């Protein structure tokens, strides 16, 4: 089994959801970002999404757009992001790590080389928001052939006709974007989320993780009662944006992660 399959299976046995944390690689700089990345599992992150900085992150809200700008100004690129994964894997061979971003940097890097290097570095999955299933042959299929999961986004506007196409070839987990719009936007109602999870379960046996708009341990706990995973990004990144120094950024992200983790772990008790 892959790291993602193993982790979600373990958590299912424990009757709890996964806390999935998102941070942008290289934000606010390489060393601080690596310290945050290495600290997340001990702070309670079950799965980590690591953003690949890009100049035009059109699906992301202001917090993550600014994180991309900070990382790019600190000279972060895909080579350094993969190096960060290698550094992380020196100390951690259990926590699933998913790279999230856009196709352009991967295309520039070269798809075959990227897949080979990502696999060697210890990447478990990819979320590439601008690669629709109609283009599975370009990245999804070769990634999965190499043993890297390809995780799809679904939204409130993905209807029952479109869903099988979107889920075709997806693996690892399904990422349900609970608000139609950009990341970090307001949270959806729990009734809406519950209906969406029920609908998705009719179409897939994959774990369902829900993100966008989750900022507090209470919100995380509410989602953890309904879904297999709770994704938090913008709320963590705000601690980096608002920190007056690097140590404050590290401490802020990891303390919120710990609080969110407690919310998720106690949600079904």
UniProtKB/Swiss-Prot annotation:
Pathway note: Amino-acid biosynthesis; L-tryptophan biosynthesis; L-tryptophan from chorismate: step 5/5
Enzyme Commission number(s): 4.2.1.20
Domain of life according to the entry: Bacteria
Keyword Lyase attributed: yes
InterPro entries listed in its UniProt record: Aldolase_TIM, RibuloseP-bd_barrel, Trp_synthase_alpha_AS, Trp_synthase_suA
The keyword Amino-acid biosynthesis is assigned to this record: yes
Key words, A-Z: Amino-acid biosynthesis, Aromatic amino acid biosynthesis, Lyase, Tryptophan biosynthesis
Catalytic reaction(s) noted: (1S,2R)-1-C-(indol-3-yl)glycerol 3-phosphate + L-serine = D-glyceraldehyde 3-phosphate + L-tryptophan + H2O
Pfam families for this protein: Trp_syntA
Function noted in UniProt: The alpha subunit is responsible for the aldol cleavage of indoleglycerol phosphate to indole and glyceraldehyde 3-phosphate.
Family statement drawn from the similarity comment of this UniProt entry: Belongs to the TrpA family.
Stated name of the protein: Tryptophan synthase alpha chain
Native organism: Pseudomonas fluorescens (strain SBW25)
């Amino acid at each position: 089994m892959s790291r993602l399959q193993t982790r979600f299976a373990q958590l299912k046995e424990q009757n709890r959801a996964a806390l999935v944390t998102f941070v942008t690689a290289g934000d606010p700089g390489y060393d601080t970002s690596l310290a945050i990345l290495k600290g997340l599992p001990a702070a309670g992150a079950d799965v980590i999404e690591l953003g690949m900085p890009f100049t035009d992150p059109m699906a992301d809200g202001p917090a993550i757009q600014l994180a991309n700008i900070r990382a790019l100004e600190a000279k972060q690129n895909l080579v350094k992001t993969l190096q960060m994964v290698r550094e992380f894997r020196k100390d951690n061979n259990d926590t699933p790590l998913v790279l999230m971003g856009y196709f352009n940097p991967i295309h520039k890097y070269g798809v075959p080389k990227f897949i080979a290097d990502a696999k060697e570095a210890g990447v478990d999955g990819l979320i590439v928001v601008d690669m629709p299933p109609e283009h599975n042959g370009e990245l999804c299929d070769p990634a999965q052939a190499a043993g890297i999961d390809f995780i799809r986004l679904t939204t409130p506007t993905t209807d029952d006709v479109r869903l099988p196409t979107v889920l075709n070839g997806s693996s690892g987990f399904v990422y349900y974007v609970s608000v139609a719009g950009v990341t970090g936007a307001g949270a959806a109602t729990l009734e809406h989320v519950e209906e969406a999870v029920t609908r998705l379960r009719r179409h897939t046996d994959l774990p369902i993780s829900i993100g966008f708009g989750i900022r507090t341990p209470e919100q995380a706990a509410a989602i953890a009662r309904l879904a297999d995973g709770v994704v938090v990004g913008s709320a963590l990144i705000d601690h980096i944006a608002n920190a007056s120094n690097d140590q404050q950024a590290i401490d802020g992200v990891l303390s919120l992660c710990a609080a969110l983790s407690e919310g998720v772990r106690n949600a079904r008790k």
